[in-house]
Structures are given as C-alpha cells and as structure tokens.
C-alpha cells in the first residue's frame, strides 16, 4: 500500500485504501501507526481523506476504540486534512449509533474551526450520528447554533424532520429587537 500512496496518483491511493479495508478483519493494534502515518503524510484533499478514513480507519476504530483518543488529538492539529480525518473516521460508527460521547467531544473541539472542509467533515459526522441519536444531535446543535458555522449546522441537520431543521436554522433575534429598541 505504501508504494501506491507514494505514487501521488489519486487512483492508486484509492486502491491502497480499498486493499487495506479488505484486510480490516486482520487489523492489529500496531496497525494504527501505519494508518496514522498515511493520514499525516498522504492526505492532501477531501477525496483521499474520506476514502481512507470512512471505511479503513473507521473499521480500525470500531475494533480498537482505545484509539478514539488519537482522533481527539488529530482534531487539534494544524493540518486541515488531519482535523477533517478526526471527524470523517467516525461516519460509519456514527450511523451505527456508536461512540456518541466521543463524536460530540470531537465536534466541540472542531466547533469554531474556520476551514470549510473541516466544518463539512464534522457536520457530516453529526448528520451520521443523528440517524441513531436524532434528539441528542438536535440538542447539541441548538445549544451551539449561535456560534456554530452555518456550513456545519446545515450538514448536521440535513436528514432531520422539517420542523427540527426550521428550529435549528432560525436565527435568534438581535438583543436590540428583543428589548423593543
């Protein structure tokens, strides 16, 4: 797989991701070092990030959840693709209702991130989590909607019922208007 990543060709990196995923039942804890090296070394766009993280690293985390702490560390790195990786790694587990406290913690770490690719990544993670935990995700969004970037908010509520979407998207009246001024 390393040679495929080193080629710099996107199609070859996708083959590396697919091949690694086909072996996910054989992962051992020490494989995290290789996966993390790929994240830090080779991710340079959303496609390579999402292809590696959604299935391959997501499957690894499902087998070895002790590495959730590493994802929280990734969420604090200067590299935008590593920050996005911290969220999109949890898309499939989130859909399955797993790791909600960790998902919310990562979303909080990334909450004020100014990078739109990171906002879309953690918004997508929240949207996936809402499939199993709609009320919890709605409450999370509502508690943070005044500061949450609209891009992330829109992604997070995309699959919610219309009435919840409308509540989440409603802008708070300015204080002056509320005070009658």
For the regions a protein language model found, what residue spans apply to each?
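Alpha-helical scaffold domains
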Residues: 1-181
């Amino acid at each position: 797989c390393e040679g495929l990543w080193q080629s710099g060709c996107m199609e070859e990196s996708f083959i590396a991701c697919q091949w690694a995923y086909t072996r996910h039942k054989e992962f051992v804890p020490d494989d995290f070092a290789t996966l993390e090296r790929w994240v830090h070394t080779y991710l340079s766009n959303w496609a390579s990030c999402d292809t590696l993280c959604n299935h391959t690293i997501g499957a690894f985390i499902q087998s070895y959840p002790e590495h959730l702490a590493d994802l929280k560390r990734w969420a604090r790195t200067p590299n935008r693709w590593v920050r996005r990786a911290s969220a999109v790694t949890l898309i499939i587990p989130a859909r399955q209702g797993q790791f909600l406290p960790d998902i919310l913690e990562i979303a909080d770490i990334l909450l004020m991130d100014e990078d739109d690719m990171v906002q879309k990544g953690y918004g997508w993670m929240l949207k996936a989590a809402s499939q199993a935990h709609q009320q919890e995700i709605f409450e999370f969004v509502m508690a943070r909607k005044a500061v949450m970037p609209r891009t992330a908010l829109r992604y997070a509520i995309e699959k919610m019922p219309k009435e919840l979407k409308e509540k989440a998207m409603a802008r708070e009246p300015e204080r002056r208007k509320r005070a009658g001024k």
